[in-house]
Structure formats: C-alpha cells, structure tokens
C-alpha cells in the first residue's frame, strides 16, 4: 500500500508524462507536493521504485517510467501545478516548410487541425546568444497546442533547461507576450541584444532568469534590462 504522498507523486508523474511526454523536474515535484526540499522527493521516488510502481531509466537525466498505477487511481487526485508543455516527438529531419509562411495560420489540412508556425532562428538554453533572426522556415503543429494569440518557434541551443524537459536541438513553441508570471518559462531579451530561454522569477525589484540545470547560475538583472518576448507553450523533439 502506498502512503498518500507516494500516491500523489506517482499520479503527478503519470499525468505530467501523459500530458507532455516528459517527466516533471524534481523542483516541480517538490512544489506540487508542498515539500520543503528535494530530498523528500528522492525518498518518495526510491520507495515507489522499490514497490515496483516506477523505474529509473539508465544513462538519461531525469528519466522515469511509470510501470503501474494504484487500483483506486483517479485523475482528480492528481495535483496540478507548474508548466505542462505539449510535446510532439518525431523522426529527425528538417521540418518541411508549409505555405504561406504566416504566424498561426491554418496549414493545408481539410479539418484545419494543424497550423503553420514560423521558425525564427535559435534561442540559447545556456549562456545568452544573439538570437531571434528572420523566419527561416515554417513547421506544422496541432492547433490545440497553441490556443489564442500569435506564436512562433525557436530552435534550442544549449542544456541549461534540461531539468524542465527541454534539450539541445528541441524546437520550442512560443506565444507572443510581453509579460510573465513567476515560474513561467520565457524568451527573455537582455539589454536589447541577447535572447535566452529561462524560467522567469522576481527578486525584489530585480528580475531573475533561472536555469533548470544546477551547472548554471541564476542571473539577476535590473527590470529595465530584461524584456519578455514570449512564453513557452510547447515543444517538438526529433530522434535519429
């Protein structure tokens, strides 16, 4: 029999993977269960692994697999907090352009179930780089991934967001926005020169751009140095 916290964590992992295709980070698990530290999450995961509910996948960062669920499983028991991106996974290869190259227009699809989103260049998930360029090509994404507003896509370079399930080579889908809430993953323009993909935080009157990789430090800026360019709503991943 599982404890309440063990069951909450198991269902949180299961629902997140069902929604986004990637497991939540340890920070997201900690916040979802209202725990004070990540050590409690490590203990819960070990207990779930020992009881045969999950297993850790070797040689992969933050890789978990849910093997079984409690008999009394109900989606309503699952805590829902933090970022839950939509994920498309497919074969490696350059996405084929879809005409016309306009933001969030219906692609050539009889049911208009897909839309064309422009890929605007690369974004750093690491040390900021000079970023957003002109439209290089378009990709087709499911319409229900986007919701309202204007969208664009960026190719990720770097590994600073791996604990948020965002890897080097992924394509992120961004909703145009000039504002963000604490905890949102955003495209941030620093000093009108460099763009980076980071989690948005506030530190008093300052803005913190927080990585999701312990190898990278959180960077603090004055509010006049950072402009939010959009918020992450989904990602696309390709494999060899």
From Swiss-Prot:
The record marks 125-126 as: Cleavage. Its EC number is 3.4.21.88. The keyword DNA repair applies. Keywords: Autocatalytic cleavage, DNA damage, DNA repair, DNA replication, DNA-binding, Hydrolase, Repressor, SOS response, Transcription, Transcription regulation. Homodimer. HAMAP family: LexA. One of its GO terms (molecular function) is DNA binding. Represses a number of genes involved in the response to DNA damage (SOS response), including recA and lexA. In the presence of single-stranded DNA, RecA interacts with LexA causing an autocatalytic cleavage which disrupts the DNA-binding part of LexA, leading to derepression of the SOS regulon and eventually DNA repair. Residues 26-46 bind DNA. The keyword Isomerase does not apply. GO terms for biological process: DNA repair; DNA replication; negative regulation of DNA-templated transcription; proteolysis; SOS response. It is an enzyme of class 3 (hydrolase). Belongs to the peptidase S24 family. Residues 78-113 are annotated as: Disordered. Gene3D superfamilies: Umud Fragment, subunit A (2.10.109.10), Winged helix-like DNA-binding domain superfamily/Winged helix DNA-binding domain (1.10.10.10). The gene is lexA. It catalyses: Hydrolysis of Ala-|-Gly bond in repressor LexA. This is LexA repressor. The active site is at residues 160, 198.
């Amino acid at each position: 029999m599982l404890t309440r916290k063990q069951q909450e964590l198991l269902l949180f992992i299961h629902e997140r993977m069902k929604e986004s295709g990637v497991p939540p980070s340890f920070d997201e698990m900690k916040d979802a269960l209202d725990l004070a530290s990540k050590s409690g999450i490590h203990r819960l995961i070990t207990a779930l692994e020992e009881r045969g509910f999950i297993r850790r996948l070797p040689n992969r960062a933050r890789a978990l697999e849910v093997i079984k669920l409690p008999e009394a499983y109900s989606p309503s028991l699952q805590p829902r907090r933090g970022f839950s991106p939509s994920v498309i996974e497919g074969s490696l290869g350059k996405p084929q352009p879809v005409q016309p190259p306009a933001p969030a227009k219906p692609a050539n699809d009889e049911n208009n179930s897909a839309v064309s989103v422009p890929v605007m260049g690369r974004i750093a998930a690491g040390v900021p780089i000079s970023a957003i360029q002109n439209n290089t090509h378009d990709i087709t994404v499911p319409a229900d991934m986007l919701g309202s507003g204007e969208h664009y896509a960026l190719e990720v370079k770097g590994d600073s967001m791996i604990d948020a399930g965002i890897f080097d080579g992924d394509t992120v889908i961004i909703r145009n926005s000039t504002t963000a809430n604490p905890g949102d993953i955003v495209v941030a323009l620093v000093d009108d020169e460099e763009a980076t993909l980071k989690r948005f935080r506030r530190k008093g009157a300052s803005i913190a751009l927080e990585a999701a990789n312990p190898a990278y430090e959180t960077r603090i800026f004055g509010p006049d140095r950072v402009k939010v360019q959009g918020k992450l709503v989904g990602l696309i991943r390709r494999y060899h």
